[in-house]
């Protein structure tokens, strides 16, 4: 079935038909198209274009068609060009010529723009719900390891001791920002395009604002041409999805490192690890690696989508058929990765003894010595130089900072007196970072207390 044809003497060539068909991927928009159709039927009734009996019959047929779609009893055929064509066929099969009245005042251009917004607004909430679940899992693990010291790293080199809980919460902060972006995105996406027609609006007495309210949008379009041309909402969603992917990749990379024999900080549950087809001893962090790998796919969805939009003249162009697959792929990818990564985090076992042993490695307390000298009135540049000499001497003699004798301290630099030993403690180093947002255990507990209501708020938005 086609929604056009009177202008043409014959049907499209088979090659064109194969190229044009999109129902194999846009069928997932069917529930949203049917929802919008019910609102459009009601506005046609208010406009005097459907009488009360016709409206009742129309709504009953749309309800029955919705049930048939949901139960798989109605499916598109190879003759259906797209989701709109298939559903109109289903309506005509149920209502005959009355079903054709629903087309009045409506174009596939404003239909698809509205359907895609409805789909993405639901999908954004589903992604946010899965993100809050991952964040909750990280918070629970962080709470268990508020007092567990770990090597804090820069350039993947030992830098300063931190609370392992503090490191886990850093990932939560990124995910909270991602959810904030989804909520902020939703404000701009909450615009209905129904009533815009093909591009110029309609000469029929439609009610775009009323339809928008019925469909849960905050407002109707301000410019009919922009309404059918605009795909900013999809591009912006794809950016947020790509950034979520980047954040998942960074967490995945750390889990990969933590599970290596060289680090040995974390043991994965068997349910979230795989083996090797040839090496019997292997236990591979596939979930974390796939989270890392899928981020490239999400970035590709965004860049491919933007390339499609570049240079398009206003109103609908057939290029926009290509807008849906990257959007659908991004949603599917996130909803595939997030539960698996949540399960990985929720079940992995932290090897606390390995973290405690590694925390002071690599002269990680050197900064504490420098800051101790600063508190005694030594200019930081001089303190930095003295402690650099201290570390250099320890490297040359293969000893740690706390293994240097009093005599050797003075020989290395006169500023290094025996009382510097007071700060050569991992526990003291953690406690000393007590400024707001720091890694001191009390501050980490404050972070957890502050995050819980934020995540509860985000979960409420996601399911509301």
UniProtKB/Swiss-Prot annotation:
Transmembrane segments: none
InterPro entries: Arg_succ_lyase_C, Argininosuccinate_lyase, Fumarase/histidase_N, Fumarate_lyase_CS, Fumarate_lyase_fam, Fumarate_lyase_N, L-Aspartase-like
EC number(s) reported in the record: 4.3.2.1
Gene3D superfamilies recorded: Fumarase/aspartase (C-terminal domain), Fumarase/aspartase (Central domain), Fumarase/aspartase (N-terminal domain)
Pfam families, sorted: ASL_C2, Lyase_1
Enzyme class: lyase
Pathway the protein contributes to: Amino-acid biosynthesis; L-arginine biosynthesis; L-arginine from L-ornithine and carbamoyl phosphate: step 3/3
Reactions catalysed, as given in the entry: 2-(N(omega)-L-arginino)succinate = fumarate + L-arginine
One Gene Ontology term from the biological process aspect of the record: L-arginine biosynthetic process
GO function term, MF aspect, one: argininosuccinate lyase activity
HAMAP family given in the database record: Arg_succ_lyase (MF_00006)
Recorded family membership: Belongs to the lyase 1 family. Argininosuccinate lyase subfamily.
Protein name: Argininosuccinate lyase
Organism: Frankia casuarinae (strain DSM 45818 / CECT 9043 / HFP020203 / CcI3)
């Amino acid at each position: 079935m086609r929604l056009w044809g009177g202008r043409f003497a014959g049907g499209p060539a088979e090659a064109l038909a194969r190229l044009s068909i999109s129902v194999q991927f846009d069928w997932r928009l069917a529930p949203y198209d049917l929802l919008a159709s019910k609102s459009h039927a009601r506005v046609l009734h208010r406009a005097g274009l459907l009488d009360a009996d016709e409206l009742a019959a129309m709504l009953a047929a749309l309800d029955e068609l919705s049930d048939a779609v949901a139960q798989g009893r109605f499916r598109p055929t190879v003759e259906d060009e797209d989701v709109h064509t298939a559903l109109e066929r289903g309506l005509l099969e149920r209502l005959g010529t009355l079903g054709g009245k629903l087309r009045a005042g409506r174009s596939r251009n404003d239909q698809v723009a509205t359907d895609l917004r409805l789909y993405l607004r639901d999908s954004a909430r589903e992604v946010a719900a899965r993100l809050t679940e991952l964040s909750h899992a990280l918070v629970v693990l962080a709470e268990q390891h508020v007092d567990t010291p770990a090597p804090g790293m820069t350039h993947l080199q030992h830098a300063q001791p931190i609370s392992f809980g503090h490191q886990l919460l850093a990932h939560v902060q990124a995910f909270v920002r991602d959810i904030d972006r989804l909520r902020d995105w939703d404000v701009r996406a909450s615009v209905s395009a129904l009533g815009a027609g093909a591009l110029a609006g309609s000469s029929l007495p439609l009610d775009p604002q009323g339809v928008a309210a019925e469909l849960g949008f905050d407002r109707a379009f301000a410019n009919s041409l922009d309404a059918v041309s605009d795909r900013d909402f999809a591009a912006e969603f794809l950016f947020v999805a790509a950034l979520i992917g980047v954040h998942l990749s960074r967490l995945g990379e750390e889990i990969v490192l933590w599970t290596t024999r060289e680090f040995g900080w974390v043991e994965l549950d068997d349910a979230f690890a795989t083996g090797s087809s040839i090496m019997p001893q292997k236990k591979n962090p596939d979930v974390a690696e796939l989270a890392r790998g899928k981020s490239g796919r999400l970035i590709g969805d965004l860049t491919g989508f933007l390339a499609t939009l570049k240079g398009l003249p206003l109103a609908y162009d057939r290029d926009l058929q290509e807008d849906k697959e990257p959007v659908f792929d991004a949603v599917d990818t996130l909803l595939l990765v997030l539960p698996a990564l949540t399960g990985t985090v929720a079940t992995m076992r932290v090897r606390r003894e390995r973290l405690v042993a590694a925390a002071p490695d690599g002269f990680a307390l050197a900064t504490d010595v420098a800051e101790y000298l600063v508190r005694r009135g030594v200019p930081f540049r001089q303190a930095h130089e003295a402690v650099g000499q201290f570390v250099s001497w320890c490297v040359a003699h293969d000893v740690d900072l706390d293994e240097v004798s009093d005599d050797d301290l003075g020989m290395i630099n006169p500023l290094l007196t025996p009382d510097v030993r007071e700060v050569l403690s991992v526990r003291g180093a953690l406690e000393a970072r007590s400024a707001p947002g720091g890694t001191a255990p009390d501050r980490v507990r404050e972070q957890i207390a502050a995050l819980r209501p934020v995540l509860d708020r985000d979960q409420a938005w996601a399911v509301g």
